[in-house]
Amino acid sequence: SRIKVEPARGSGHAWGTEMKGDVSLLRTRIGASGMDYKGYNIATHEFGHNVEQTITTEMVDYFPLYGVPNTAFTEALAFIFQKRDLTLLGLQEKNPLKEHMMALDNAWACYEIMGVSLVDVNVWKWLYNHPHASAGELKEAVLSIAREIWNRYYADVFGSKDEPILAIYSHMIENPLYLSAYPIGHLIDFQIEQYLSGKDFAAEIMRIYSQGRLIPQLWMQGAVGSPLSAEPTLKAAEQALQVVK
């Protein structure tokens, strides 16, 4: 096996290897009473990362191109695996509206995490303009920017103003400009899922992710035969709204 499982102090993460023959680490939360569903669900997400890390390290034919174009592409496979958590347990979803519900879920997930991404981008713009800011000043700036983004894009939908919830992700300080990988990852995930329908899952994932670290649109063309776009997600969500009441 190229994946080693370890307990996580936090919620969990995947740590990839940097050389062939080594193992990637899958870390997830296992409580005193054992693993609960949340820990398992996170573990399947991280497992998707580990599979990507293994394929893109071991199976890219030109090693200097090992990896993926950017973080969004590994998040996409993590989302694809995470959605299959119950299937891995032998539980089959028989809801006839599943496809439409998944389309709506993907669109909504993009909408939610895009707000956090915008906070991330604007916080770093603020930091560039205030290079000597203290931790306290940064905290107040993050909260102010979070409220501003909320009021602009979310207040009318949720019916409340000045909510600071979009400031919750510490990623934006620990891993600068990482959070935008999530909404783009959802778009990639959706396009790959559409492409995978009726095909051999394992064979296609191996083929797609063994392309290596190409430029994003070239990678997408090779993966699904079309460029990265929000259009498939928006179109599917619009169709779903005609069916799901």
Tell me the role of every PLM-derived stretch.
Residues 127, 131-245:
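C-terminal, non-catalytic "cap/extension" segments appended to globular domains
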Residues 21-26, 54-62, 93-100, 119-128, ...:
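Short acidic (Asp/Glu) and glycine-rich catalytic loops that position anionic groups and cofactors
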Residues 55-106, 185, 225:
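Post-HExxH zinc-binding segment in Zn-dependent metallohydrolases
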Residues 2-9, 69, 73, 98-101, ...:
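A glycine-rich phosphate-binding loop feature that marks nucleotide/adenosyl-phosphate handling sites
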Residues 13-14, 30-42, 64-73, 102, ...:
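Alpha-helix capping and helix-loop boundary segments enriched in small/acidic/polar residues
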Residues 1-22:
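Auxiliary, metal-adjacent structural segments of Zn-dependent hydrolase domains
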